[in-house]
Amino acid sequence: MNVVLKQRIPLKIKRMGINGEGIGFYKKTLIFVPGALKGEEVFCQISSVRRNFAEAKLLKINKKSKNRVEPPCSIYKECGGCQIMHLQYDKQLEFKTDVIRQALMKFKPEGYENYEIRKTIGMSEPEHYRAKLQFQVRSFGGNVKAGLYAQGTHRLIDIKDCLVQDSLTQEMINRVAELLGKYKLPIYNERKIAGVRTVMIRRAQASGEVQLIFITSKRLDFDDVVIELVREFPELKTVAVNINASKTSDIYGQITEVIWGQESINEEVLDYGFSLSPRAFYQLNPKQTQILYSEAVKALDVKEDDDLIDAYCGVGTIGLAFAGKVKSVRGMDIIPEAIQDAKENALYMGFTNTHYEAGKAEDIIPRWYSEGFRANALIVDPPRTGLDDKLLNTILKMPPEKMVYVSCNTSTLARDLVTLTKVYHVHYIQSVDMFPHTARTEAVVKLQRKE
């Protein structure tokens, strides 16, 4: 290794890495510099030395990129949640398309050099797009603060005005923190596993309805807090409590109870309505979700005699968009509340050709196949960990004719394509910017079974 810890070096940034950092070479050593942009010449200090690379802190930019902008967020550097806010937005979209190429070059699925990778679809107004927040709460001398941990630490950043967060949910979390302090509710700390740990607030774009979850290590009396919140925020329709007494980093425990209001809120996507219970997964960016799901529908190109499996179905949002166009839809999800929502949503919409089960896709789909069911269309929308090996093997043994992979992690997507391209051709990859100003992107992949 040609560098040592705390060494200060000049560096030319050759490209950007998948996490939004600048990458350069110093005496043939690969150096990652968060905050640096392609084409810049910087002065940096080595902060970490690994076997094959080093990380450095940006000290000074000697030659700025013409694509650099001043981040409009006052806590941009301190927070670290928006890794590329200093990059002009149209160039962010180019970067996200390139991230897909980088992932493919690393894993090299069959034929990757010839894949059609379409330009990333961005937002016309890439601010205040997050309709859901999950803020940690901590008490500092009796003063309750809510926010996120600084990147790579357990140091809470008090966030009062987040540029990418929905304005109403931000206003509500600010008030929640005040009320938790006012009524002296116990607040979690890592020495005493007791009190309120996290607050989740989600607003439905279509209805404007809001739901709130207090994640706490024990049962508490939230009556006074709820009374004030309901009086001040007429949009608030659901208040729930989730009990998580574990010492793990898991946000949620197994028990969720609605303590005030209705069981769910109402949302819409692709011109149909559905319900969201407090624990159910739904995309963070409702406006771009319309585009993401439209691209998925277009890519799968179903026929009326198709039997469709919607793996990782959540509340049924993607699958229900197909239900009126196919013979049947089957879906599964690991969250029982989401499956209950999916069943109720299908019933509400009048569909009788749907079937939903709670459980893992890698367990349920092989069982369905062993029972004689066959799907000729498959859509998967897995978590960031990608597809389970067991599910991949099932797909290889009995591949549906057509498949769409909706990915939230380009690395696991490229990894899974190594397996999937044994039986499928990749027609194209369409990325959609669901998280402006961050290094993350989502992608819709159209796959067709090989003849």
UniProtKB/Swiss-Prot annotation:
GO BP annotation list: rRNA base methylation
Keywords recorded for this protein, A-Z: 4Fe-4S, Iron, Iron-sulfur, Metal-binding, Methyltransferase, S-adenosyl-L-methionine, Transferase
Listed Gene3D superfamilies: 2.40.50.1070, Nucleic acid-binding proteins, Vaccinia Virus protein VP39
MF GO annotations: 4 iron, 4 sulfur cluster binding; metal ion binding; rRNA (uridine-C5-)-methyltransferase activity
InterPro entries xrefs: MeTrfase_TrmA_AS, MeTrfase_TrmA_CS, NA-bd_OB-fold, SAM-dependent_MTases_sf, TRAM_dom, U5_MeTrfase_fam
Domain of life assignment: Bacteria
Sequence ranges assigned to domain TRAM in this UniProt record: 2-60
Positions with a binding annotation for S-adenosyl-L-methionine: 283, 312, 333, 381
Listed EC numbers: 2.1.1.-
Binding site for [4Fe-4S] cluster: 73, 79, 82, 162
Active site: 408 (nucleophile)
Database matches in PANTHER family: PTHR11061:SF45, RNA M5U METHYLTRANSFERASE
Protein name: Uncharacterized RNA methyltransferase SAG0413
Native source organism of the sequence: Streptococcus agalactiae serotype V (strain ATCC BAA-611 / 2603 V/R)
